[in-house]
Structures are given as C-alpha cells and as structure tokens.
A protein has these predicted regions:
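Conserved phosphate/anionic-ligand binding catalytic regions in large, soluble enzymes, centered on
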Residues: 4-18, 93-116
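Active-site histidine-anchored catalytic micro-motif
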Residues: 101-108, 119-153
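Phosphate-handling active-site elements
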Residues: 24-31, 112-122
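Flexible, glycine/proline-enriched loop segments at strand-loop-helix junctions
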Residues: 62-66, 92-99, 130-137, 157-165
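Short coil/turn connectors at secondary-structure junctions
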Residues: 1, 88-89, 115-122, 144-146, ...
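Glycine-rich nucleotide/cofactor/substrate-binding loop typically near the N-terminus or early
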Residues: 9-86, 143-146, 151-156, 160-171, ...
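Acidic, glycine-rich active-site loops and adjacent beta-strand->loop/helix elements
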Residues: 7-11, 35-36, 97, 124-133
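General beta-strand structural signal in soluble alpha/beta enzymes
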Residues: 5-7, 88-95, 121-124, 158-159
Length: 183
C-alpha cells in the first residue's frame, strides 16, 4: 500500500498523526496509544542528542521504531548544529527535547509501523508564515531548523496561513519517512 500525505494545509505532527490514524481502526489506534504509555518515555527535558538517544535506546518498543526515532532526532540535531554553527555533540535541544515532544514523535513512529505502508509519498509542505515564540525568542516562520531541514529537498507550497504549520520535528519526520513528493 502507498500512503500519501496531504501537507498542503498543514504539516504539523497533529496533521501527520491524523492522516495516519485515518488508515487505522479505533482498536489499532488504542493499541498505539497504549504502547506509547507503556514505552517508558521520561517526562524530563533532554538537552542534547546523547540524552535523547539514551532515552530512545531504553524504550520498550520494537527496534524498527527506535531506529526511526534515532534517525528523526539525528536529522533534528544536524539541522540545529547547522543553524547554530556548532558541532553535532554541542547542539542543545529546546522544545524538541521535552518529554512530550519525544512521546509525540514515538506515537507517529508507532502509527507508521501500524499502517505499515510499502511506500510513503506526500504533497509539497505548507510551512505557514509569520512569527513564532520559542526558546530563542521571536522567530520567523519557518523556524531556522525547519528551513534547514526543508532545504535538503523537501518541496514547499505557497505559505497560506499565519501560523507555524511545519515545525522542526514535523519536518524531520517528513524527511525521514517520505520517499517521494508529488501533488
């Protein structure tokens, strides 16, 4: 089965999750949610890629899901290092390092595993426009880390909403899972 994401209106983690959930039964969604709760993601803030990877390695989930999560956070760490002009091991995670963000990323990885598509395609990505408040203060949309990830070959569409419609984490998820972009 080919899974096709429509990101023309939103490319947030919520949009990704909703589109994945539409392919699953309520029982499958409940099983994913239970797996997230049982996985053991701590609620504290993870400051760097080493802390995130240690948490991922300890999760009670299939190895494929851990591999997906490590790849997504590696994409994020490389983007942060590029934006801040520092070495990978000196990147500092702000919003993407909190426990809720890691749980949300885990949930999407588990949803992808439950859908089990042979191939994933997507439309160009809606980023939105305007400003967003984050740990670094008020920033343009897309945020620098988001823009860095999108610049690696993820096509975007004309911004059409004054909001952050693609975050660094959702851009990294898209970068990892989507194999082809088409309208």
């Amino acid at each position: 089965m080919v899974l096709h994401f429509n990101f023309t209106e939103s490319a947030t983690r919520a949009s990704i999750a909703e589109q994945l959930e539409s392919k699953l039964s309520p029982a499958q969604i409940s099983a994913v949610d239970e797996a997230v709760e049982q996985a053991g993601v701590p609620g504290y803030h993870h400051h760097d890629i080493g802390e995130v990877n240690a948490t991922i390695d300890a999760l009670n989930v299939p190895e494929r899901v851990r591999d997906d999560m490590r790849t997504i956070y590696d994409i994020l760490a490389h983007a942060e290092a590029q934006v801040h002009g520092c070495e990978l091991e000196h990147t500092h995670f702000h919003e993407v390092g909190n426990g809720a963000s890691i749980r949300n990323t885990l949930r999407i990885c588990l949803l992808v595993e439950a859908v089990n598509p042979e191939r994933i395609t997507a439309t160009p990505v809606q980023t939105g426009y305007g400003k967003v408040e984050c740990a670094h203060g008020l920033m343009d949309i897309p945020a620098p880390a988001t823009a860095a990830i999108l610049a690696t070959g993820i096509p975007t569409c004309e911004p059409s909403g004054e909001a952050e419609l693609c975050t660094p984490t959702s851009a990294a998820i898209i970068k990892h899972f989507v194999q082809e972009f088409a309208n």
